[in-house]
Design a protein with these regions (language model features):
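Soluble "head" domains of membrane/secretory-pathway proteins
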Residues: 2-23, 62-329
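Short, intrinsically disordered low-complexity segments
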Residues: 8-10, 41, 49
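Hydrophobic membrane-insertion alpha-helices, especially the h-region
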Residues: 26-44
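Generic hydrophobic/packing signal
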Residues: 38, 43, 53-55, 135, ...
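Alpha-helical transmembrane signal-anchor/signal-peptide segments
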Residues: 45-62
Length: 329
């Protein structure tokens, strides 16, 4: 009798151990499935990104998190081999570019997340940037006195776009910094050399409100190129006057000349993988053959930050190739 009780208890112990093993196995499978599903969602559908700078103010603030859709334009498959969503990858291995079908194309005005084109290394390991698309493949873009023209049509800045302004008060009047801040001015500074002269960042709507105050003699966009020299002046001029600049797209025949070569040199040599250099007779040596044109293999986009006077964007470092686009914010 005692032996039968012992055997029964031993069987119960074995059965209990088997149940715990099954539970552990079920939990492990569930954990692996959940992890795999989360990775697939981040890879193919949605991913959160943190805004690293003030270049998109006032639309997006530095430190904000945005959810980026990879479904709109189609998810880009990995271009390097490494641990997903980590900095580790195997150097020297670059996978071919392929994007799954999306349900829309990039439109003017879209805010996109992309890999910073200037950096070297695998495309999908480059730093993430966020900007607004202003120029599309096939567009001719020109910036004059801070106004953006696309195909000769002025493009209004987004309602929350911010820029630098210059304000002159009427003689004998005063305006407090607090009142300017209350009206929407940011980063306010007062001229040390001219009484009643202020500089500040603000949206167009805030600038209109401030301009209506009786103390204001003049309010206009602030331009800096005339006050600077050297590389600083050149960069400022690019912020305020740029182009005209043709934005190439896939299948375009890009004709080269001494005038256009500086615009497209990086695009052709870095992103189109051509070996190109100018010849003394006005021709170009293109992949070992003299000529004047190249066929473009992918689309390109011109992007700007909404905080126009405090943004390093396509005015400074060029176009965004299609294979660098991550998704829509």
């Amino acid at each position: 009798m005692a032996q039968e009780v012992f055997v029964a208890r031993e069987r119960e112990t074995v059965a209990e151990g088997a149940r715990w093993r099954r539970r552990g196995r079920d939990w492990l499978v569930a954990l692996l499935l959940a992890t795999g599903l989360a990775l697939l969602i981040r890879l193919l559908a949605l991913e959160a990104y943190r805004i690293p700078s003030a270049s998109m103010e006032q639309t997006l603030q530095a430190g904000d998190f945005v959810l980026v859709s990879k479904l709109h334009y189609g998810a880009r498959l990995p271009l390097s081999l490494g641990l997903p969503f980590s900095a580790w990858y195997i150097p020297g291995i670059r996978l071919p570019y392929f994007r799954l079908p999306g349900f829309t194309h990039i439109q003017r005005g879209d805010v996109i997340v992309f890999n910073y084109p200037v950096e070297t290394g695998p495309v999908d390991r480059k730093t993430h940037y966020i900007k607004r698309v202003v120029g599309l493949p096939g567009d001719t873009l020109w910036i004059h006195d801070k106004i953006v023209y696309v195909n000769r049509i002025p493009i209004a800045a987004p309602e929350q776009a911010q820029q630098r302004w210059l304000l002159q008060l009427r003689t004998g009047t005063e305006l407090s910094l607090d009142s300017l801040e209350a009206a929407g001015a940011r980063n306010i500074s007062r001229s040390a050399f001219h009484a009643g002269l202020f500089f500040f960042d603000a949206t167009m709507a805030a600038a209109r409100t401030i301009a209506q105050r009786p103390e204001v003699e003049m309010l206009r966009p602030y331009t800096t190129a005339a006050l600077l020299s050297g590389e600083a002046a050149q960069l400022a001029r690019q912020q305020e006057d740029f182009g005209p600049y043709y934005i190439p797209g896939r299948g375009d025949t890009l004709w080269l000349s001494p005038r256009t070569w500086p615009f497209y040199r990086e695009l052709l040599t870095r992103f189109e993988n051509h070996q190109v250099y100018p010849l003394p007779n006005g021709l170009f040596m293109i992949d070992g053959q003299p000529g004047r044109f190249c066929i473009i293999q992918q689309d390109y986009y011109f992007v700007l930050g909404d905080n126009r006077d405090n943004s390093l964007d396509s005015r400074a470092w060029g176009l965004v190739p299609a294979d660098h686009v991550v998704g829509k914010a």
